[in-house]
Amino acid sequence: MENIKRAQEEFKELIESEYARIDKMKQAEEATDFSKKEKIIVGILPGDGIGPIIMEQAVRVVKELVKDEIEAGKIELREIEGMTIENRVAKMESLPSDVFEEIKKCDVLVKGPMVTPRAGDGLPNLVSANSLLRRGLELFAAVRPIKIKDKGIDWTFFRENIEGEYILGTVSYTHLTLPTNSR
């Protein structure tokens, strides 16, 4: 019975935190109209592994595409440091709070790949930085439009990012095995 009570308490805390998150979203301000902003800050988060290599080329392309806006001061590209696996391991934080504060100052974020430690790779067990970013920034869905005109395909796929199978996030839960299940 004690395991059931503990599981109920943990599940209650989880549900209460989700309701608090939903209430916070309801109180959030309206979506930003970027056409009315004096300056748009684009955060550049290289990540690690091949991330910095990919991002170097992505930034090169972005700089060319919005060259006039950058020169006019309408767009600022701001590199955000501190999300390498080495830094995250040194701080023992998947998403260091100082880095997250810098990310939240940006209007747009261009993010490279980030390593998520796995069993056996010699790194400490850290939660996925990607999932923490999604949850922290309330990125509730990944939208993938697919159009192939000559085949008549015009589809849009929505992939849940922070609810559904992701609802538990970094919260652990109690797994109960009853004697009848272990025979």
Language-model-detected regions and their locations in the chain:
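Short, ordered loop/turn segments at secondary-structure junctions
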Residues: G47-G49, G82, M114
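N-terminal phosphate-binding or glycine-rich loops at protein starts, especially the Walker A/P-loop
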Residues: F11-K24, A28-I70, E76
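Charged, compositionally biased N-terminal leader segments and the immediate start
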Residues: E2-L14
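N-terminal glycine-rich phosphate/adenylate-binding segment common to multiple enzyme folds
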Residues: N87-Y173
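Residue-level detector of functionally special positions within alpha-helical transmembrane segments
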Residues: D48-G51, D107, T177
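Conserved small/polar residues in nucleotide/adenosyl-binding loops
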Residues: T174-T180
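Short connector loops at secondary-structure junctions
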Residues: G73-R88
